[in-house]
From Swiss-Prot:
It comes from the Bacteria. It comes from Citrobacter koseri (strain ATCC BAA-895 / CDC 4225-83 / SGSC4696). It is an enzyme of class 3 (hydrolase). Keywords: Hydrolase, Metal-binding, Zinc. Its EC number is 3.1.3.-. Zn(2+) 1 binds at H7, H9, E73, D192. One of its GO terms (cellular component) is cytosol. Homotrimer. GO terms for molecular function: phosphatase activity; zinc ion binding. Transmembrane segments: none annotated. This is Probable phosphatase CKO_02035.
Length: 245
């Protein structure tokens, strides 16, 4: 069990089914110390309004010893790597995940997909690329991993990709993990929970990491401190409430 989960959705994304309170309760039950709420960016049809993300500033940082990070799963919009998280939204959030979603950026050829993903990483606004192993969006995995290491962006291994969505991701995710290993980059594990019951579920991710002998010291989820140091290295101000996590 890893004590950090970096990817989940609440009822604010209306195809998800749990509240912030549900996730806090499940985190306490499972021993999760820190998690990030990452509802879909506003360009998705059922995503929350941009005010939702700006107003996350009213959330407490800690509830019953569980740390809450304010995040988003933004959409990569075009080959220039623009995302639907700008201005006050960027300044209000701790964790910016970005990825491809068909309603916003339709699948293209490998070269175009790769260009868009690398441009998003190069923008300096993205901390994690979500589900880069999605077979609907072929990319040059070696180039993506090298760019991620260069720009200090983590590539996600997404547990949901092996269970509920993006079927056929296994080979790509294995290749992503191996390429990140070779490039000396970071991986982030995400449950991609759309219900609190799956918070912190990484069993399928763990299989992929084991198969490629991925170094544990390059997994962001190992401890709250490791993740927070990574985010601080990318410009996030230290969060005093998390000092004892």
């Amino acid at each position: 069990m890893y004590p950090v989960d970096l990817h989940m959705h609440t009822v604010a994304s209306t195809h998800a089914y749990s509240t912030l309170h549900d996730y806090i309760a499940e985190a306490k039950r499972k021993g999760i110390k820190l998690f990030a709420i990452t509802d879909h960016g506003p360009d998705m049809a059922d995503a929350p309004h941009h005010w939702h993300f700006i107003n996350m500033r009213i959330w407490p940082r800690l509830v019953d010893g569980v740390g809450i990070l304010r995040g988003i799963e933004a959409n990569i919009k075009n080959i220039d790597g623009e995302i639907d998280c700008t201005g006050p939204m960027l300044n209000s959030l701790d964790v910016i995940i970005a990825g491809f979603h068909e309603p916003v950026f339709a699948p293209h050829d490998k070269e175009t997909n790769t260009q868009a993903m690398i441009a998003a990483m190069a923008s300096g606004n993205v901390h994690i690329i979500s589900h880069p192993g999605n077979p609907k969006y072929p990319v040059d995995i070696t180039a993506i991993a090298q760019a991620a290491a260069k720009y200090q962006v983590a590539l996600e291994i997404n547990n949901s990709s092996f269970l509920h969505s993006r079927k056929g991701s296994e080979d790509n995710c294995r290749a992503v993990a191996a390429a990140v290993r070779d490039a000396g980059g970071w991986v982030a594990l995400g449950s991609d929970s759309h219900t609190a019951f799956t918070l912190g579920e990484f069993a399928e991710c763990r299989k992929i990491l084991d198969e490629v002998d991925f170094p544990e010291e390059r997994v962001l989820n190992v401890s709250p401190g490791r993740l927070l140091r990574f985010l601080e290295s990318r410009g996030m101000a230290p969060i005093p409430e998390f000092a004892e996590l």
